[in-house]
Amino acid sequence: MAETSTSQSAAPDTGTYAIVEASGQQFWLQPNRYYDLDRLQADVDATVTLDNVLLVKDATGTTLGKPYVKDASVELKVMAHRRGPKVIVYKMRPKKKTRRKNGHRQELTRVMVQSISVGGKSIS
């Protein structure tokens, strides 16, 4: 009996997305998904617009900015302010009685991507 397997080596099609720069990092954002960014100075349920869009992909093709895509923006809705997981930092000097233990929790903002627009026209 012969067995057939259907495996694809190519990555699945992700549809519309944008790569944006926020808080010194680059994020791959898709419409109607939520993401955790570094703490934003915005109230819960407020709308935040990111204009530092590096790349936009939609059904018509891919637009790459040099460095940013002209007239492109991503609208985000602030869902909640939260804190990340605790990270323990432990420093010790060998053969001395010096030990220091610190904990850190990053302040985060959970956002939902409302829309991605290029040239004033929403593509998502």
UniProtKB/Swiss-Prot annotation:
Record keyword rRNA-binding present: yes
GO biological process: translation
Bilayer-crossing regions: none
Keywords for this protein: Ribonucleoprotein, Ribosomal protein, RNA-binding, rRNA-binding
GO function terms (MF aspect): rRNA binding; structural constituent of ribosome
Keyword Cell membrane among record annotations: no
Pfam family, one: Ribosomal_L21p
GO terms for cellular component: cytoplasm; ribonucleoprotein complex; ribosome
Summary of the function given for this chain in its UniProt record: This protein binds to 23S rRNA in the presence of protein L20.
Subunit structure: Part of the 50S ribosomal subunit. Contacts protein L20.
Assigned protein family: Belongs to the bacterial ribosomal protein bL21 family.
Designated name of the protein: Large ribosomal subunit protein bL21
Source species taxonomy: Bacteria, Bacillati, Cyanobacteriota, Cyanophyceae, Synechococcales
Gene: rplU
